[in-house]
Amino acid sequence: MKLSFIIPAWNEETLLGLTIKSIQQSAEDFEFEIIVADDASDDRTSEIAKELGAIVVSCNNRQIGLTRNDGAVVATGDLLIFVDADTVVSKTVVRETVEAIENGAVAGGSFPMFEGNVPLLAKVITPTLRIMFRLLRVAAGAYMFCTPESFEKAGRFDPKFFAAEEVHLSNKLHKFGKYKTINARVVTSGRKFRTHSSFEIMMTLVLVTIPGIRSIKKRKNLWYGPRTPQ
């Protein structure tokens, strides 16, 4: 099974290298490719990706769903794995991902752990959100996987949504087979908690679990706002 890791990126020179290296180490037992969809970065994002051997797709969307789609278009693997540019993947995560597909799932995800200093509100609410996402069988964004066939049948990521596009795709993927939330967890940056209030972030995560909520489109700044190193 060939794995295609797709990383949407915008001005991710600080953390992208760590993400790519974690994938390379974690997927070494499999045939794999790493695709970085660079959404008009004005830093060294593309250069770092190329230096580390990743395939770089240049785009100018300012829309994470379309950027993920652009990366998927050039993928040649038997499994599409979408990883955020600030997320570290382990061997256990990759192994459980492959096992999920081998056991009949067509899609799935991993609920992330946040690194660094995280506000108390986030620490309190995150376990509840993890249960909600598992019960609803939707991806939390930092790590999601699906077969190319189910991805196309579901219509790819919906460009109407500037955020939470993975939740809406997850709901559509349910029509085409089993969805599996793996037990292993990726580690993602807690930097958003340092540029946005924990209440804003937690409410965004809660809203995306509610069918029909589209106000999430207005929260583009949460994904394309100022970057902090860590």
Residues of each region from the PLM?
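Acidic helix N-cap motif at the loop->helix transition within catalytic regions
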Residues: 14-18, 43-52, 92
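Conserved donor NDP-sugar-binding/catalytic core segment of glycosyltransferases
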Residues: 91-120
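A conserved acidic beta->alpha catalytic loop
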Residues: 38-46, 87
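Short aromatic/hydrophobic "clamp" motif used to bind/position activated sugar donors
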Residues: 80
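Acidic donor-binding loop at a coil-to-helix junction in glycosyltransferase catalytic cores
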Residues: 163-169
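Glycine-rich, basic loop-to-helix element that forms the pyrophosphate-binding segment
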Residues: 59-75
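Short, well-formed alpha-helical segments that are part of the catalytic scaffolds
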Residues: 11-26
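Short beta-strand/loop segment that forms part of the nucleotide-sugar
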Residues: 7, 20-21, 31-40, 57
